Amino acid sequence: MQYGLEVSSDVAGVAGGLLALSYRGAGVPLRELALVGLTAAIITYFATGPVRMLASRLGAVAYPRERDVHVTPTPRMGGLAMFLGIVGAVFLASQLPALTRGFVYSTGMPAVLVAGAVIMGIGLIDDRWGLDALTKFAGQITAASVLVTMGVAWSVLYIPVGGVGTIVLDQASSILLTLALTVSIVNAMNFVDGLDGLAAGLGLITALAICMFSVGLLRDHGGDVLYYPPAVISVVLAGACLGFLPHNFHRAKIFMGDSGSMLIGLMLAAASTTAAGPISQNAYGARDVFALLSPFLLVVAVMFVPMLDLLLAIVRRTRAGRSAFSPDKMHLHHRLLQIGHSHRRVVLIIYLWVGIVAFGAASSIFFNPRDTAAVMLGAIVVAGVATLIPLLRRGDDYYDPDLD
């Protein structure tokens, strides 16, 4: 099957094809989506300053610990500013004629706001007073259950091996899969939030990739209302992350806290779930494995870095005879700092690795999967070289002020 755009060696042809996207297929409201995303960014950007002052007054401040990278007390609760941007942008989307039917015929956006409010409440309490792991986990399950109760759940699953194909999930399987993936992504984003700008940047990259994939679904299905929720959810999240990044990039003036990282995880889970639910094998064909697996690959992109870090940490600590959950300064970002990368470069390198997987999966709906895989392979080589360069040039007197 041919997708709407073909990869070509002619750069001008590819650019022209991408520009033609807005004219192909009914109901692809690119301008409205861009406006909604920009609104989320602006509200978040201007709300972050007041939230920073509020966090300082309430005592929601992260004081440096031995294993932390930051060296000065820094306010958190930045997730509140992001949530305000998201709520404002979703309200605007509900008033725009081109996006209104996404609210009338789907509960995706209202579900995200309600579940987001739950996770925001849990996160804010944790940012200020701290919560034990069990209480926090219960809050995450509650927020994920809100999504399921309001109709945001995985209904089909494509398995490309063994001739299985598309599986229609029963209610119990649908609930369990949705809860498991949602809580996993929420915790993955919470786990990776260890460097200035890292979680916000990963949220931005992955949300843009999901939005790109959702726009492709809208184009291919003539503006089917089922594909509005993932497009709106992802572009709103991308805008909120973009608006927060100027305050959070190294050296950060404010941290997003658990309220922010868990909110990003919840919305990414909701966006990928609403993107995956309506996809039909009849629409794309069994051989288009990349397109059918893209929602899962986008989930993998979010979880790739934190899960790799977590697995390495468990192996490292158990081999040393310590608890698998005992803290240390040997996380992936610590190692990248130690080999000679600056704080900013570590963040940018992780952006690159996640972006390769995220945009590689999302672009499968526009480009030939074989060409996409070839480009991804080349990008992986480039990312690998960029990661290892300090080992080749580093001397005993190597120094970078950003490491301080």
From Swiss-Prot:
Pathway: Cell wall biogenesis; cell wall polysaccharide biosynthesis
One example of a Gene Ontology biological process annotation: capsule polysaccharide biosynthetic process
The keyword Cytoplasm appears for this protein: no
Site (Important in orienting the substrate): 126-127
EC number: 2.7.8.35
One GO MF term attached to the UniProt entry: glycosyltransferase activity
UniProt cross-references to InterPro entries, sorted A to Z: Glycosyl_transferase_4 (IPR000715)
Reaction(s) catalysed (UniProt annotation): trans,octa-cis-decaprenyl phosphate + UDP-N-acetyl-alpha-D-glucosamine = N-acetyl-alpha-D-glucosaminyl-1-diphospho-trans,octa-cis-decaprenol + UMP
Note: Mycobacteria use decaprenyl phosphate (C50-P) as a lipid carrier in all known cell wall biosynthetic pathways, rather than the usual undecaprenyl phosphate (C55-P) usually used in Gram-negative bacteria.
Protein name: Decaprenyl-phosphate N-acetylglucosaminephosphotransferase
Lineage of origin: Bacteria, Bacillati, Actinomycetota, Actinomycetes, Mycobacteriales
Gene giving rise to this polypeptide: wecA
